[in-house]
Amino acid sequence: MELIDYIIKILIDKKATDILLLDLRRLSPIADYFLIATANSIPHAQALCDEIELRIKHDLGLLPHHIEGYNPAQWILIDYIDVVVHIFLKEVR
């Protein structure tokens, strides 16, 4: 849960909204958790992604397995294997 708590703190610090944690452990072999948040603009979505990637790498020593959707940034997926972060623009979510 350390990774999840850390990502949630980053999302809150960077003004993401509608943060939702979905526990998928009993539902899907793909990931244990989906963490979903809303950004208010494309630059905001990209800044959230950048900050998560930078701080998790620096503070926890983890790199994402995959990042998808950075451009056009209407829906960015950051895959940390057990935790998958989804950052949506409000109109896409």
Predicted features, each with a name:
Residues I78-Y80:
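Active-site beta-strand termini and strand-to-loop segments that position acidic
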Residues M1-I30, N40-I76, K90-R93:
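Polybasic/polar functional segments that serve as interface/processing modules
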Residues I36-T38:
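Short hydrophobic/aromatic beta-strand micro-patches
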Residues Y33:
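Phosphate-binding and adjacent anionic-ligand microenvironments
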